[in-house]
């Protein structure tokens, strides 16, 4: 498959995922709609991610053998540490989120993202729905590094996007290169009461 056709196929999968998120948001999607999307994603990953395909074949699962989305093999956590699991070339990924490495510091798990549009779309709706269903913005104090300090941290991305999209005046990051800004946190809390 050429790079152009891979890109076209990847863009179609992405568009369909974004449409699904837009359509269903935090509502329960019909089983048929979720099943169709999960199968589409699985078929794409099976075709373009050799290491995942090898794992699926060892489990005797192919796109043709699926009876429903629950047959799709989840990759064990160690797979993200030992394998390169991406359906597009690593060099074309906008972001690579990594685990903290607490169990194996020299062998951190990696999660590759061609771009962050789907990730961002899947984050903001649930955040608004579950954290702040009755308001547009809230004061947010982030006590961990911002995205600018930790480009490999999904939590850093999550909290940065939450603050950008939902934070009101007075929101901020209180963890900097020198560590936690205790005085800043104290001022933030004093203003909150």
Question: Which stretches of residues belong to each language-model region?
Answer:
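Serine-centered coil/turn micro-motif
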Residues: 49-50, 153
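Generic detector of short alpha-helix boundary/capping microenvironments
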Residues: 33, 48, 87-88
């Amino acid at each position: 498959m050429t790079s152009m056709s891979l890109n076209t196929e990847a863009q179609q999968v992405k568009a369909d995922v974004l449409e699904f998120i837009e359509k269903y948001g935090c509502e329960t999607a019909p089983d048929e709609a979720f099943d169709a999307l999960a199968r589409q994603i699985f078929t794409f990953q099976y075709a373009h991610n050799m290491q995942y395909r090898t794992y699926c074949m060892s489990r005797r699962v192919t796109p043709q053998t699926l009876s429903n989305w629950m047959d799709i093999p989840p990759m064990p956590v160690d797979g993200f540490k030992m394998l390169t699991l991406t359906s597009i070339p690593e060099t074309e990924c906008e972001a690579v989120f990594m685990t903290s490495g607490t169990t194996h510091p020299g062998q951190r798990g990696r999660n590759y993202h061609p771009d962050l549009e789907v990730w961002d779309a899947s984050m903001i709706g649930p955040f608004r729905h579950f954290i702040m269903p009755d308001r547009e913005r809230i004061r947010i104090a982030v006590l961990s590094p911002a995205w600018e300090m930790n480009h490999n941290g999904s939590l850093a991305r999550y909290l940065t996007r939450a603050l950008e999209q939902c934070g009101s005046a007075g929101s901020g990051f209180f963890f900097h290169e020198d560590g936690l800004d205790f005085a800043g946190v104290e001022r933030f809390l004093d203003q909150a009461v």
